[in-house]
Curated annotation (Swiss-Prot):
Probbly involved in recognition of ribosome rescue factor SmrB in stalled/collided disomes; fusion of protein fragments to its N-terminus decreases ribosome rescue in the presence of SmrB. Pfam families: Ribosomal_S21. It comes from the Bacteria. The gene is rpsU. Part of the 30S ribosomal subunit. In stalled ribosomes contacts ribosome rescue factor SmrB. InterPro entries: Ribosomal_bS21 (IPR001911), Ribosomal_bS21_CS (IPR018278), Ribosomal_bS21_sf (IPR038380). It comes from Escherichia coli (strain K12). PROSITE patterns: RIBOSOMAL_S21. GO terms for molecular function: rRNA binding; structural constituent of ribosome. This is Small ribosomal subunit protein bS21.
């Protein structure tokens, strides 16, 4: 859980914004959304594999685009 220290004479809005930013960087909300419902291990593995395939395809597309531009 991200912790921030409220500075002297710091407005509440600014402290809240800093806290939200630190939560976003730590990935707290994404983790909560991911754990909201139970996901079977097979479904979790399937989703992770699909994500890896998509990431790999994206990487190949980037490399291919870079190769075609250099002529």
């Amino acid at each position: 859980m991200p912790v921030i220290k409220v500075r002297e004479n710091e407005p509440f809005d600014v402290a809240l914004r800093r806290f939200k930013r630190s939560c976003e960087k730590a990935g707290v909300l994404a983790e909560v959304r991911r754990r909201e419902f139970y996901e079977k291990p097979t479904t979790e593995r399937k989703r992770a594999k699909a994500s890896a395939v998509k990431r790999h395809a994206k990487k190949l597309a980037r490399e291919n685009a870079r190769r075609t531009r250099l002529y």
